[in-house]
Amino acid sequence: HSYGEYVFDWSWADAYRRHGQHYYPKLLSAVPFTPAAGPRLLLAEGVAFADLENELLATVGEEMARRGASSWHLLFPEQPVAEELAVAGLGHRTGVQFHWHNRGYRDFADFLDVMQSRKRKQLKRERRLVAEQGLQVRALRGPDVDAALWERFHHFYQLTYSRRSGHGGYLNREFFRLLGQGMPDSLLLVIAEHGRDVVAGALYVIGADTLYGRYWGCVEDHAQLHFETCYYQGIDFC
């Protein structure tokens, strides 16, 4: 199957089926649930990908034949690797993502100042609306997130998957506990409180120069709350 890849190739699988072919099994090199480009091939220190490319492709071909696989998929590789494989004749699929870049902004207000007046007013109104609904939004670094809050966020995560996919998600409660325990300094959890209740949350992973938005969920629907927790708070942090 293709679950958890965040690359939607269902139409390819359907095309194979309509032509009497089997799309599965397929070979996959990826980091599960992570639609962000990065290293996907483990190489010894000092070894360049170009040095092993021919051997790699030959081995992949042999493994495809041995397993009866239709294809090999390398998801979200680093750009140089993707370009070299395209030159070697592999199909190169281009996806579209939207990334926000900090172009030297000092803070969120500085970011707003570069916008046209209409858009600036709109964003201010959206953020103000969250507070007007009685919501308090806080951004917590990993060390400040306790076990009960991780438990709560796992519930949010399950609700999002249940609403969109009809199942409770791929990651269990223990995953989030271990995440908070093993790499707390690399985590940012944005929570929204309504009275005494935590009603929504968004989880980010902090990289060397990038903030990665990962999961979100809520138990109450409020106007603009998704944008506040998943976009504006992230921009604020950056």
Where are these regions (language model features)?
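N-acyltransferase acceptor-side catalytic subdomain
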Residues: 1-238
